[in-house]
Amino acid sequence: MREEDTVCVGSDGLQYCKVCGEAKEAFFPEGGFMGMKKHSRQCACDRKAYEEEQKYFKDKEHRELVSRNTSICFDESRMEEWTFENADMSDAVMHKAKSYVDNWEEMKRNHIGCLFWGPVGTGKSFIAGCIANELLKQEVMVKMTNFNTIIDDIFPLADKTEYINALASYQLLIIDDLGVERNSEYALGIIFSVIDRRIRSGRPLIITTNLPLKEIKNETMLDKRRIYDRILEMCTSMYVGGTSKREVIASMKMEKAKTLLNTNRGEEDCE
């Protein structure tokens, strides 16, 4: 639409918006300014257009930041689908995980982390991923990794301290599957350094593990006990039980395969 179609000149000589009726010009105080008697101003339509433009760029910047942080957070793209929207929110632990996010500022201020423990396949990693994705939406810097990856990444580095400090710098660090990594003296030394540096940073830590809590609390091996004591010092333990979700999925796939195979067999018999 042309400007002349939306603007008219009032009896006072000022331009007015035909849509909202507000003036698009205003007079300078008496005497004018550098020989000019009037200056431009935003009408309601202009202000609305400006606000919409600012919102567009702010939303675009937010989406790009979240996308960038998400790619840094996860090693596998499938983890991006681990969200509360895709979860069974009637589950008690899942509800607590959502409460953790809802109270993130307080959790962060009080350095409160979580230890999700329980049998294999019950959804501990999924719960941690839901927390990560929800906080990523809030522009929180999160890193979700495991000690096998950390040990592999750190092994060839001359300056291991820089890598460990980088892990400590994330607003939330999630270590998945504690206990599946190698038990060598070198590996345990790296694990302790990462955990200890994280705790000294004062930033929250979330751990998932298949190890029984009793085993964690009663560990007799000195190197492991030092690690577990530091974790229990910072993390609230939550048991994640129930039927193995992996077994349920595998069973569903098996039933689907049987159905398809039987269907195909029936078609062959009819030929």
Provide a role label for each language-model segment.
Residues 1-94, 248-271:
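A short, basic N-terminal segment
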Residues 94-101, 117, 132-172, 182-189:
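Short glycine-rich substrate-engagement loop in P-loop NTPases that contacts/grips substrate
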Residues 90-112:
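A short, well-structured juxtamembrane/interface segment
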Residues 177-178:
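Walker B catalytic acidic pair
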Residues 108-128:
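Walker A/P-loop nucleotide-binding motif
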Residues 109-110, 138, 167-169, 200-202:
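Short loop/turn elements that form and flank the Walker-type P-loop nucleotide-binding site
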Residues 172-174, 206:
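Structural motif
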